């Protein structure tokens, strides 16, 4: 949900979602959504450089998961995931930003939830079955 309006939130409130993944909202807006709609929250923090990293702290009280994504999240852009290496381990982290099959080994010893959405597409918005199969095979090789 990208800065969801009250109308959108009202329309989807009866759908059986466990989490709302929310972009471009302030911590206060996240708190409001969490309290009113009683959903678990994935708060997206966009990262371009190291100065953006500490923005997550304001969202922690209202978020079950913090998603670190690139500034161009709608365009499947990437950011330097190594910026996250010194982050504290006391909260759940999700990473996105055009993660591709070849990137999997970089995350082997990390406690990240990985959003590979754009990295598994041949055409923007359309997943590739062969890329999904290759990704799952790579995951099995790395963790087995």
Question: What are these language model-derived features?
Answer:
Residues 12, 30-38, 84-88, 133-143:
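Surface-exposed amphipathic alpha-helices with a cationic face
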Residues 40-42, 106-107, 113:
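A generic structural signal for ordered secondary structure
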Residues 14, 35-36, 56-58, 80-83, ...:
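Short, glycine/charged-enriched secondary-structure capping and boundary segments
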Residues 62, 89-91, 110, 142:
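Structured helix-beta-strand junction loops
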Residues 1-4, 8-34, 39-58, 64-77, ...:
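Catalytic beta/alpha-barrel core
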Residues 23-28, 71-75, 110-133:
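Glycine-rich phosphate-binding active-site loops on the catalytic face of alpha/beta enzymes
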Residues 20, 66, 80, 84, ...:
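Conserved, mostly hydrophobic/aromatic
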Residues 94-106, 121:
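A C-terminal functional module that forms or caps the active site or interfaces directly
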């Amino acid at each position: 949900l990208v800065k969801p309006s009250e109308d959108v939130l009202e329309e989807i409130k009866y759908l059986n979602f466990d989490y709302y993944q929310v972009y471009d909202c302030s911590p206060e807006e996240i708190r409001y959504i969490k309290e009113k709609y009683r959903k678990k929250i994935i708060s997206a923090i966009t990262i371009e450089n190291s100065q953006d990293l500490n923005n997550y702290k304001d969202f922690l009280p209202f978020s079950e998961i913090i998603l670190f994504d690139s500034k161009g999240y709608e365009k499947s852009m990437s950011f330097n995931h190594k910026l996250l290496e010194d982050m504290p381990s006391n909260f759940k982290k999700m990473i996105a930003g055009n993660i591709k099959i070849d990137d999997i080994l970089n995350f082997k010893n990390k406690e990240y939830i990985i959003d590979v959405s754009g990295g598994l597409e041949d055409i923007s918005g359309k997943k590739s079955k062969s890329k999904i199969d290759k990704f799952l095979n790579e995951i099995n090789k790395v963790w087995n």
